[in-house]
């Protein structure tokens, strides 16, 4: 038996005015997903427990079968693990976004966050900037590490997680940052690093070139997602099978790595609609040759939600359907039996541009046990089935049951 999870990050949504008050799932042409849904168990699942923030960290841990109430220590430590940082028990890791702040004469605290990802800056440009920041601001206490695109890492030696509210930048796009900077005393050294980064980055040659090319500058770091070293139990130890992960983003690769799952590196995997869809599908099939389960994560729908791009979100769903699922179907033909689970981790509604905690649609298809499902899967048809998984982390055990 082989198992495949296809995770469409942030795919679920609310009705979108620009889409005639339909959701992207309703608008997308997705014949392959709908074909599975017609022969599968379909329902809703609550991936984010009450009291937890609806982040991709918590939600993906749930889908992968790890209870965040037991295992979650923060977002950035998982990303740090992915890029090979060996954290000490006394270290604190913080996500370090490269963002675009308004270029005006106002004090730093009064600037507006124009883009949480600096126009989806390339990994190559970002590495130059993060290494420059580490050269100028790094100390024995603070060390910056480059990651992928706009997503990077700060390790704080003997740091604290008692930092007040360190707001995710994608939650406040278009807003003045004054009320979103932590006022906690322990956070002030971090706020100072952010302020100093603006002065260092605003006239950096990389940003001068970006502006000349019509792109937004990556003119500040933004620190959030703090946490201590994670301690996940190995996936195989819990579930008795070998698992693997395919993703463009460090967070998901970090969860997989911490759980002792095999993690693929796919050239051209970007985390946006320009990602190497075929490469990720083929990497998943390669992993299935020596693993029992593969978890394929696609970031693009989530990014489009954050960026208020309804047409691109629809297209992201369609591209996975066109360019990933057919490859998986063909590659799975040789196995006597297999199961496929498709779902988002959480909604990323276009109208709010940030994550939500609402239950999300899921489907579980079993090759040798096809059942009557729904003609098309979306938020409404999944709800109409009456199937509901209240405890998100239980979905993995359910998926693996015969």
Language model features by range: what are they?
Residues 1-402:
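Feature captures the catalytic ectodomains and active-site-proximal regions of enzymes
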């Amino acid at each position: 038996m082989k198992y495949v999870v296809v995770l469409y990050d942030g795919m679920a949504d609310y009705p979108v005015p620009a889409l005639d008050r339909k959701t992207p799932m309703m608008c997308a042409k997705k014949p392959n997903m709908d074909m599975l849904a017609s022969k599968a168990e379909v329902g809703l699942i609550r991936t984010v427990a009450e009291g937890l923030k609806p982040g991709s960290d918590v939600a993906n841990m749930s889908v992968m079968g790890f209870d965040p109430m037991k295992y979650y220590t923060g977002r950035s430590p998982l990303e740090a693990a992915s890029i090979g940082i060996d954290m000490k028990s006394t270290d604190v890791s913080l996500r370090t976004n490269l963002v675009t702040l308004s270029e005006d004469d106002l004090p730093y605290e009064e600037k507006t966050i124009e883009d949480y990802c600096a126009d989806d800056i390339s990994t190559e440009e970002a590495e130059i900037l993060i290494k420059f920041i580490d050269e100028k601001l790094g100390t024995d206490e603070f060390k910056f590490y480059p990651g992928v695109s706009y997503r990077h890492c700060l390790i704080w030696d003997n740091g604290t997680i008692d930092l007040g509210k360190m707001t995710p930048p994608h939650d406040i796009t278009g807003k003045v940052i004054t009320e979103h900077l932590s006022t906690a005393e322990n956070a002030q050294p971090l706020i100072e690093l952010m302020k100093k980064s603006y002065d260092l980055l605003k006239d950096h040659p990389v940003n001068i070139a970006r502006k000349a090319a019509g792109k937004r500058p990556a003119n500040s770091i933004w620190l959030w997602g703090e946490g201590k070293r994670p301690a996940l139990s190995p996936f195989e130890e819990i579930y008795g099978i070998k698992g693997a992960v395919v993703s463009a983003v460090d967070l998901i690769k970090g969860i997989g790595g911490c759980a002792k799952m095999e993690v693929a590196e796919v050239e051209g995997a970007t985390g946006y609609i320009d990602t190497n869809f075929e490469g990720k599908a083929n990497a998943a099939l390669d992993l299935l040759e020596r693993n029992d389960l593969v978890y394929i994560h696609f970031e693009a729908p989530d990014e489009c939600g954050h960026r208020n791009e309804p047409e691109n979100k629809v297209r992201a769903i369609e591209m996975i359907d066109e360019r990933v699922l057919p490859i998986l179907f063909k590659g799975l033909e040789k196995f006597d039996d297999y199961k496929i689970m498709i779902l988002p981790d959480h909604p990323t509604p276009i109208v709010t541009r940030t994550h939500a905690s609402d239950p999300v649609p899921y489907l579980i298809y079993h090759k040798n046990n096809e059942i009557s499902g729904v003609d098309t899967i979306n938020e409404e048809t999944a709800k109409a089935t009456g199937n509901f998984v209240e405890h998100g982390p239980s979905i993995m055990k359910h998926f693996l049951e015969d």
